Amino acid sequence: ASSLSKGNTLPLALEPAHRHRLSEWPEAGTASICPQKLAAVYLLSSRIGLWRRVLPHISHGMIDFSSVSLRGIDPRDYPVYRAAKGLYCGKLLITSAELADEEQVSSEAFGDILNAMLIARYGKTIIAAEVKK
């Protein structure tokens, strides 16, 4: 049995700017959000540069990763993008060696990736003060 069963949540507090970006997603307040999709959107919206590139490619609840241009992004955002895409697609796209390399993944990004993994597993109940439209 999970230690985060119903009623026992580990709320994640979001920075106001991150919460605002997440609320821009049309499905943010939807009760039936797939946890993996929410985890990917949570992670992508954690970085303003990524979010600006990805948001136009979200339609009808789907993220069209093949249409997202990554040219010119901050190199430290690329592992965050790959982790989000992996969570969304159900594939491991970032290695433990990459996660452990502080030159590739900052401590903040590492924390965001771990939070996204928790969201993918336990759903939106772990996000404190649920995002509302």
Language model segments and positions:
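Extended, charge-biased low-complexity segments
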Residues: 1-85, 89-133
